[in-house]
Amino acid sequence: MMEADRPEKLFVGGLNLKTDEKALKAEFGKYGHIIKVFLIKDRKTNKSRGFAFVTFESPADAKAAARDMNGKYLDGKAIMVAQTIKPAFESSRWVPPTPGSGSRSRFSHRTRGGGSSPQRPPSQGRPDDGRGYVGYFDLWPYRAPMPRKRGPPPRHCASPPHKRRDPGDFVPALREYSRRYYGHSSVPDYCPXRGDGNRNGYRGRDHDYMDHPSKGSYREPLKSYGGPCGAAPVRGTPPSYGGGCCYEEYQGNSPDACSEGRSSEALPVVLPDAYSRDHLPKAYSGGRSSSSNSYSRSDRYGEEGCYEEYRGRSPDAHSGGRNSSSNSYGQSHHYGGEGRYEEYRGRYEEYRGRSHEARSGGRSTDAHSGGRSDNAYSGGHDSSSWSDCCGGGGRYEEYQGRSLDANSGGRSPEAYSGGHDNSSWSDRYGVGGHYEENRGHSLDANSGGRSPDTHSGGRSSSSNSYGQSHRYGGEGHYEYRGRSHDAHSGGCSADAYSGGHDSSSRSHRYRGGGRYVEYRGRSLDANSGGCWPDAYSGGHDSSSQSYRYRGGGCYEEYRGRSLDANSGGRSPNAYSGGHDSSSRSHRYGGGGCYEEYRGRSLDANSGGRWPDAYSGGHDSSSQSNRYGGGGCYEEYRGRSLDANSGGCSPNAYSGGHDSSSQSHRYGGGGRSLDANSGGRSPDAYSGGHDSSSQSNRYGGGSRYEEYRGRSLDANSSGRLPDAYSGGHDSSSWSHRYGGGGRYEEYRGRSLDANSGGRSPNAYSGGRDSSSNSYDRSHRYGGGGHYEEYRGRSHDTHSRGQSPDAHSGDRSTEAYSRGRNSFSNSYGQSDHYGRGGRYEEYQGRSPDAYGGGRGLNSSNNSHGRSHRYGGGGRYEEYRGPSPDAHSGGHDSSIKSYGLSDRYGGGGHYEEYQGSLPDAYSGDHDRSSNSYGRSDRYSRGRDRVGRPDRGLPLPMETGSPPLHDSYSRSGCRVPRGGGRQGGRFERGEGQSRY
């Protein structure tokens, strides 16, 4: 009779000798909470013996694990998993050894014909010590005395006694298991051989492991079980571990205790009492095969299914630049739901070795090294272990490998964290864990490419690590308490981040109850290119006490000298020139007012050549729940996010690499967020491809195609004057912030003037845009007015060649190339909602839209409209005069038509023409023109009159039409009889 003695306890056999406790816990942990993982090791060598015990908290979890894992491959070897069982015999009495009965084993065997010594009660032998688990692995430390004198073994196989149960009841064919897991059977059908026990038994090589009356032996002869001639051991009941097979430890002489089985001599195993307190687990991988570093199967973000992330065994871009075919991610519910998500499944090799590819610019064997190293990403280590990343009860080890983005400006292969673990286990945004974020060498490697472990200047910032806390919830303490050398000094200062002070007091960062003093120290990221130790706020308190995004308090954001000190190592006050760049307000909610970005510039992305450049090598803010809620806001999308090359490299973002490939980054099915091409293509961001496909980025029910154009942040390596999108639409339909409308973001020449400092229409130019700042308003809601960009003073948008922002010239005020732009200013309106009107750019003087030719652009002015909603019309840029979109030519045919730009039922005709313009770098980009359509909605045609039988505007070979929106007043309908058609980008041949 057999029964599960401890159903929560599993026996795991057939293990690879390189598999350690951590790998076992990772692999089995997905089935439930594990109390203990006990890997059997050799006492002398402390090496694995190839089997282990895993104890779950729940027997049901253990049963599920045994069912699923039995026969699966772990680190290249098929393993056996079974619940430990208790063999129950009709007699529970222990049988002492038969005097004079020697054998190969140290233990005597009863035979059918032979007698046995009188039985003694359990109290005299190996007792059942309350655990009820009696087996050959539990004989330690209790041993009955062994006779000193050994007699000759039996001459033949004796039949078992009549009360002896068939060994198959508790030890199924051992040969079957050993053949399956070790290549051939090492358990022959045999009778105990003749000979002296001292020569044939365990005395020879392992004589020191002979039995002792006081201590007992810790080895068991596995040959004693399961053979047709084998009898029950007289000193204990035979063990079994369920699952239809008995585990046989490899008995050969090979160092690999689980590999071949060339010898019949059993190797020792160490089984300390109560599952070992003596032996520590082996190191994780140390840069070797990442098979044991693989992610376990788990519901990473959800509840059902299995997640096999990074389960292979060979190193790849994550582990040293070798074959990543087996490192692919397996099936999983990545973020929940019911289907299976296979991320990096099969033979997808991202950063796959030595082939030239767009991400490495043809130089590198992997992506993140900037073309110089083949192990930039994780240096052979596992860069993320198993977890429930954003929920549940798991633990999250984020970015354990050497680097995240290898953002070292292309100079170091270990830019990110220098091979250290920069994030320990935690529920990152969840409930009960601790979060220690950024413990390693660096967070963003923002040292301008001067140090091998870029962020910390070659030193260890581990003591600066965040303390235990619930970062976004709970009641712990928060972050960055140390004072030693850390990442933000660029290798120059020992106290770059907080000047030796506690840069964040106790608080609930985004939750109620506490106060949050954020970035009180000298700097946030010391993004000064390694030149200034106080890059962030010049030693001032850059954030007063507040609830950052929650109700009740006031928020003074970025009061210090700068936001990110992204000065490329030239200026300590890059962002706001020492002024308060944000007054008190509830930023996006409540009843206050918000003055956003009053300082010098918003991004000042001038390519790292101006003292107040945004990205000259730095960035302190990556993706986060900046504004709360369920979405994520990616801030600072200038030249680079993390790997700002220090103003030295044209591949500003991450050295030509994508640190997030195919995935649902924020939900949906997008491809990638930052697939940078290595700075060799004028469309540096995504190589002309759509780097983020359909998804609901921030919610809603529509699709968001973000960054569809050539680049997001003018990642053109400084080669094109149309740095932003290279003539394409870099953001298509979407519900950016939710709701039912659609939002087209960043359609202009560039967002951040990311032209590498070579274009006259650069965004940031390095001038003061404080007077051009946004006025007080409820930017995204409420009932106030929104006056956008009214000023006339010198600002950042001219790239240092003109005192104004949008003109790219030398005029004295921002918008109109030297003329009075008061009339060009935006009128009062509800910019994004409710019942007001939006008068955008109503004036009549020469302006930025007029190309500086001095012509009257009154007809170019925007008409009254609800720009993003309501029932009005939007007349954007109707006139015939030269303008910024046409490179000084007549763009009347490119003018925008009457329409509700973001709502209503009209058509939106955007940029249909064929003339050289800011989008095309002075080349003919007719195929890039936008077609007439309802770009953002369906509905009634408000462009022209009913159908006149003309072909659709985007049809190839259509005859050119008149300028329907020129001053001649000619209104030629362009709908072809189709009312409310959806907008489609003119990727092919355009009629204009």
UniProtKB/Swiss-Prot annotation:
The species this protein was found in: Pan troglodytes
Keywords: RNA-binding
InterPro entries: Nucleotide-bd_a/b_plait_sf, RBD_domain_sf, RBM, RRM_dom, RRM_dom_euk
Low complexity composition bias: residue spans: 284-296, 318-334, 454-471
Gene3D superfamilies, A to Z: 3.30.70.330
Origin superkingdom: Eukaryota
Pfam families assigned: RRM_1
Compositionally biased region (Basic and acidic residues): 297-316, 335-371, 472-488, 785-798, 831-842, 920-948, 981-992
GO MF term set: mRNA binding; snRNA binding
SMART domains documented for this protein: RRM (SM00360), RRM_1 (SM00361)
Start and end residues of each RRM domain: 8-86
Keyword RNA-binding: yes
Gene: RBMXL3
GO term, biological process aspect, one: mRNA splicing, via spliceosome
Stated name of the protein: RNA-binding motif protein, X-linked-like-3
Biased composition (Polar residues): 564-574, 644-664, 752-774, 818-828
Chain intervals for the UniProt region annotation (Disordered): 91-130, 144-169, 188-207, 278-385, 397-511, 562-588, 644-992
